[in-house]
Amino acid sequence: MNERNAVFFDVDGTLFKQGKNVPKSTIRAIAKIRENGHLAFVCTGRSRVMVPKTPILDIGFDGVVAACGMYADYQGKLLFAEEMRQEVLDDILPVLQRTETMYILEGTEYIYYDENTIGNAIDDWYIDAIRTMIPGHFIPVPKDSCKIRASKVSIQVPPQRAHEVIEAAKKNFQILLHYDNIGEIVPKGYTKASGIRRVCELLGIDRADTIAVGDSINDVDMLQFAGCGIAMGNATEPAKEIADYVT
């Protein structure tokens, strides 16, 4: 390894758990990483607008990889920001509406919700958290899909319709299910690992000099890709199995 490494941290379940603050020990550890000349990045499935200054960025990071590898910035400057193509949106949205799937479209600046299905949310805390975190940026899906600027879709699908949604989505998307019927739909070819790879190429960082820290199913690819993959003690079994170390 070179003298400078790049460390990529997942957010939910890694930096902090639902309803809890970021541990002071974690804040100190990230500060120490940077003091020693290394780079620290957020690497999350959340879209960029869902990575607020408080409580996340105030910790002190060099950059952000968001939306499962579709967005990245470094030292306040945009590196890349990809969006779902309109024809892809026009293909999947009718399926989500027909199956009464609660879905939100996550973009760099806005989170869009469907007024007809928002009431089908299985976990109200998730919707409440978005409203609290980004007031003014949580808006109804525009009637004209041309106005949508989204990178990924988060879904809560009725269990009996899950197979239908998965079958319809697999043409253009990869589906990451955190539970049987709660998950993320991300355009094919984009993962946290692809985001890290692209950041490394742009910044001249060797893959061997990367460290990834995560806990969930959408962290597996980056734990495998990084020079060193670290799974949290509370991680899912797939994450633990692929990691080099478990905390």
Regions found by a protein language model. Name each.
Residues V7, V64, M102, G229-A231, ...:
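Short, well-ordered beta-strand core segments
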Residues I33, V153, L223, D244:
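Residue-level signal for inorganic ion chemistry
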Residues E3-K20, L223:
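Asp-based phosphoryl-transfer active-site loop
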Residues L57-G60, A67-C68, A168-N172, F225-A226, ...:
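Short, structured coil segments at secondary-structure junctions
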Residues M1-F9, R28-A31, E35, I205:
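Non-catalytic pre-domain segments flanking phosphatase-related domains
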Residues D206, F225, I230-T247:
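Asp-based, Mg2+/Mn2+-dependent phosphohydrolase catalytic module
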